[in-house]
Design a protein with these regions (language model features):
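C-terminal cap of thioredoxin/glutaredoxin-like
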Residues: 63-67, 72-76
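Local sequence-structure signature of Cys/Sec-based thiol-disulfide redox active-site neighborhoods
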Residues: 1-29
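BRCT (BRCA1 C-terminal) domain core and associated BRCT-interaction motifs
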Residues: 39-41, 45, 57-58
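A short, hydrophobic beta-strand/beta-hairpin element that forms part of a small beta-sheet core
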Residues: 54-65
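Thiol/disulfide oxidoreductase modules built on the thioredoxin-like
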Residues: 47-54
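Thiol-based oxidoreductase modules, predominantly thioredoxin-like and allied folds used
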Residues: 10, 30-42
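Residues that form or flank phosphate/diphosphate-binding pockets in enzymes
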Residues: 15-18, 41, 67
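Generic C-terminal helix-cap and adjacent flexible tail
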Residues: 78-82
Length: 82
């Protein structure tokens, strides 16, 4: 696994989130998962960070991408070469 600062805000039932998780796994990137569906406080935290509550959303250091699986995957490919 490649050590990263990636935090993925997601829900297990979300197909768009599954797509991002699959990409992260395929690229062997280590990441932290925050399941917003299980913790209402995390949904509030998501709104404070991104201004929206849509998932998947991701933070990687200074980079924040909200509610867009295609943009997250494009970023991962560019930043981590995959």
């Amino acid at each position: 696994m490649i050590d990263t600062n990636i935090v993925l805000y997601q829900a297990e039932w979300c197909p768009y989130c599954a797509r991002v998780r699959s990409k992260l796994t395929d690229m062997l990137l280590d990441y932290k998962v925050v399941n917003v569906a299980q913790d209402h406080g995390q949904r509030t935290n998501l709104k404070e960070i991104f201004g929206v509550t849509g998932i998947p959303s991701m933070i990687d250091g200074e980079v924040k991408i909200a509610d867009d699986d295609d943009a997250i995957i494009a970023y991962l490919e560019k930043a981590y070469g995959g």
